[in-house]
Amino acid sequence: MAHKTLIGGTAYALKGGRDLIGGTGYSIKSGKALIGGTAYDIQFAVKVPLNTVEPGAILYLNESGSPVPFYIAKHDYESAANGTGRTLLVRKDCYDLRGFNSVSNGTYLNSALDTWLDGTYPNLLDSSVKTLLGKTTIQFRSSADAGGSPGVYQRTAFQLSTTELGGTQAKSPEGSVLPIADMLHIAYLNGTACAQWTRSVSGYYNPRVDAYIYNYIAWTASGTEGGGTIGAQLGSRPAFTLPGTLEVIQQSDGSYTVAA
């Protein structure tokens, strides 16, 4: 049964028998296999639906052709708006550091960050995954000074809200706290903790947007809710949904890959 196995940081579709890995043919069987002088655990696992995997697990998806880890963050994401069956994926690490917007506008709607996530970023994913993204209904405010409830918008990929991260400083709730919120408070880029944007307008830092700021504390790392100015270079962290019926396979390290 073909599936993806990470070998030396690269995902290979292994069918069993003789497989080509890094230009060399190897005889692959379930169990231990010696590849390039290193022993790997090879298991031909059973395909399972994405929505049966415990939130917090890692799913590897190709980004610009290379495997990147994503948290399986929530099943039936915002089901009142999206219906049942959509699973939220959040990039484990930030993609890069970038400004929220290039003009003095403190809202997410059509900001530089919003435009990049919804328009450019999805094209980095494999076409087979991109076609499954569709549009996800999310909530955010269209104006820093608007009262009442946040608006409802559809996006292919987006930044999380401060509410979803467990924060309380937004003008009003945008969605609900994610079951793995505590795992998302600290964001990293190239192994270094960094601040990450949210799509939320802050009730305390008007017209800024909420950000989770990394604080240096001896021997610990702590994510705290704070504020970020429009041009600050903070972390972009793509999130999107995939069908819960998508078949995935567990690897020997406990992570998952999309079934071939």
What are these regions (language model features)?
Residues M1-F44:
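Intrinsically disordered, compositionally biased repeat/linker segments
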Residues A2, Q43-A260:
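Collagenous Gly-X-Y triple-helix signature in extracellular proteins
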